[in-house]
């Protein structure tokens, strides 16, 4: 079963999968997701499909915060990445340069889903 990573920012949906294996996020207008926030770096983070995993790669000055959620929407423990990588699972939020608990213009929603054929 193939998986897809769905990212939602400002009601726009972006997908990372075998056909689109990478996506760049940041404040600069050359990113796939242009994050409109002073907390975000110009080139902030990248999501890559690697084998059967999705990896978040922080490339920022202020770090990327990851706030996972379980199926019922309960939030887990927030993780701060600084020039690090994290294998993603389930669903949750990314905070670009600021805590993801404060949803706003710096926040991107993520969720892993099984592809339907």
Q: Which role fits each region the language model picked out?
A:
Residues 15, 44-46, 55:
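Short, surface-exposed charged micro-motifs
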Residues 22-50:
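Short, charged beta-strand/loop "edge" motif centered at a coil->beta-strand transition
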Residues 1-6, 21:
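Short structural boundary motif marking the start of a folded domain
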Residues 32, 65-66:
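Short, solvent-exposed loop/turn segments at secondary-structure junctions
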Residues 18, 25, 60, 66-117:
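C-terminal boundary/linker segments immediately following FHA domains
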Residues 8-11:
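Short, solvent-exposed loop/edge segments of extracellular or virion-exposed proteins
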